[in-house]
């Protein structure tokens, strides 16, 4: 970003938008909805490309992610917020989504396991920050060479500090996630923690191998047993954390 000062009375959100309009050119739009837009930008002084998110969201999630570097998460460069809206400038990951690959052909177990382990590394970092991704699915994984990158933090939230609250308070009040991949507790049945991401990852791993949800067609052998444990309805019966899942894989 250019080293220019804020205009007196200008919010950082307005300043950030002004800097973006001067330094970047919009190449294309990945997504546009009534209240959000995801654009691909090119820096005017180079060929480097970035993703710009313009949407409602939780700035604290992105601030936490700015503090880490992980090969399997996009780097968050800058953000600004105003009245519940966010502008987020993040790393552009070239490549196809995992959904694109699975739509073309199923993956060998070895390749599927490698991708799952890389997403486990991304989740290890997020869970270490106290974050739950809450929308792990093939369309939110970009494959760039041998690198798998978990994207889209619009559904991400912080884990609650006190998971065992009195009845009526120990559950999520906002339903987020994608049908088929979201853990049962994400539908307001219980409080969400990192085990919800393990459920989604288990479903995704099964889809990579069989093309279907594990409830309809479960992968065979040892990997099928790992997937079965990941996707238990009761979170207490799943792997307790992502490290244990990585060991199982």
Give each language-model segment a name:
Residues 127-143:
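Catalytic-loop of the protein kinase fold
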């Amino acid at each position: 970003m250019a080293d220019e000062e804020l205009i007196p009375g200008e919010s950082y959100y307005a300043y950030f938008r002004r800097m973006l309009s001067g330094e970047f050119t919009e190449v294309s739009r990945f997504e546009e909805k009534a209240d959000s837009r995801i654009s691909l930008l090119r820096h005017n002084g180079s060929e480097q490309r970035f993703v710009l998110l313009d949407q409602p969201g939780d700035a604290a999630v992105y601030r936490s992610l700015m503090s880490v570097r992980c090969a399997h998460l996009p780097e968050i460069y800058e953000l600004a917020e105003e009245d519940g809206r966010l502008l987020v400038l993040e790393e552009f990951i070239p490549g196809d989504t995992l959904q694109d690959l699975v739509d073309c052909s199923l993956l060998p177990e070895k390749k599927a396991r490698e991708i799952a382990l890389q997403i486990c590394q991304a989740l290890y970092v997020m869970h270490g920050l106290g974050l739950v991704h809450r929308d792990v699915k093939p369309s939110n994984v970009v494959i760039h060479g041998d690198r798998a990158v978990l994207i889209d933090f619009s559904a991400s939230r912080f884990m609650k500090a006190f998971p065992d609250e009195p009845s009526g308070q120990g559950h999520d009040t906002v339903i987020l996630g994608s049908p088929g991949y979201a853990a049962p507790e994400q539908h307001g049945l219980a409080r969400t923690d990192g085990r919800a991401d393990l459920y989604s990852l288990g479903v995704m791993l099964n889809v990579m191998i069989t093309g279907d949800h594990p409830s309809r067609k479960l992968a065979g052998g040892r990997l099928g047993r790992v997937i079965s444990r990941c996707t238990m309805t009761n979170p207490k019966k799943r792997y307790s954390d992502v490290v244990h899942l990585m060991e199982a894989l």
